[in-house]
Amino acid sequence: MSKDIATPGRTTEILKKYGFLFKKSLGQNFLIDSNILTRITDTAEITKETNVIEIGPGIGALTEQLAKTANEVVAFEIDQRLLPILDDTLSNYDNVRVVHNDVLKADVAEVITEQFAKPELPLKIVANLPYYVTTPIILKLLHDNIPADSMTFMLQKEVADRISAVPSTKSYGSLTIAIQFYMEAELAFIVPKTVFMPQPNVDSAVIHLKRRKEPLAKVNDEEFFFEVTRASFAQRRKTLWNNLASKFPALKPRKEELIEGLNAIGIDLIRRGETLDIPEFAKLSNFLADFLAEK
């Protein structure tokens, strides 16, 4: 059996063998600490009755750990230069398939059906996400309604803080709401920048997202709900009124009527967006949708 990939020596050996040079544009940072990999698979609760989608396998360090613990692993890799390396490093595992595709452009549901021998098994998504595409990837997976029980991501600590934030904190914002509306979010542990090659400028964190049985609040129009939440954080230091009136100019001539209606459901327009929790944003968006629809 070959040595684990996730060590400084083995990673350097693989990179030299293939003359691989990191592409900064792809945000490539490879893990060189196998203990972190074990903690990731433990956090994700991977078992032999679990299928896993991995995004951005790199040279296969996390993929290898997933292959040891999961039923099957399907990994999306955008960098064609890594395909022969992955063929080599993962040659001992017959339960891994690498798909050369950009997950942002892929039909992930179709890949699940085509690539897994038992697509009916519980699905989990695990990834060491490049910093520059973290948010688009997570939001795509949520909006495409990929049937994953959970998603476990290693990402920039600042982004993990934003995803797992609570109201009235600096990190709380529209990203928090976009994810926590559908998923329970737990920041599992911090990953120091020293366990990557090359070493990034900031620490990372592993976040575990578990799908809720139902969205956290009932909204009449999800698209409008997210439009309202984004508008409410457009300028964080401004009040709800200032941000919403800027987004929806039709509110301006009816300000007093709006204040009265929102006060009746416990929402004061002099508050800032960061003070509202998700159920309050749901009440706000449902009210605004009806209010704006009135002639």
From Swiss-Prot:
Biological role stated in the UniProt entry: Specifically dimethylates two adjacent adenosines (A1518 and A1519) in the loop of a conserved hairpin near the 3'-end of 16S rRNA in the 30S particle. May play a critical role in biogenesis of 30S subunits.
Alphabetically ordered keywords of this record: Cytoplasm, Methyltransferase, RNA-binding, rRNA processing, S-adenosyl-L-methionine, Transferase
GO-annotated molecular function: 16S rRNA (adenine(1518)-N(6)/adenine(1519)-N(6))-dimethyltransferase activity; RNA binding
Gene3D superfamilies found in the cross-reference section: Ribosomal RNA adenine dimethylase-like, domain 2, Vaccinia Virus protein VP39
UniProt record similarity statement: Belongs to the class I-like SAM-binding methyltransferase superfamily. rRNA adenine N(6)-methyltransferase family. RsmA subfamily.
Places the protein is found: Cytoplasm
EC number: 2.1.1.182
Name of the featured protein: Ribosomal RNA small subunit methyltransferase A
Cellular component, GO annotation: cytosol
Catalytic activity: adenosine(1518)/adenosine(1519) in 16S rRNA + 4 S-adenosyl-L-methionine = N(6)-dimethyladenosine(1518)/N(6)-dimethyladenosine(1519) in 16S rRNA + 4 S-adenosyl-L-homocysteine + 4 H(+)
Residues binding S-adenosyl-L-methionine: 29, 31, 56, 77, 102, 128
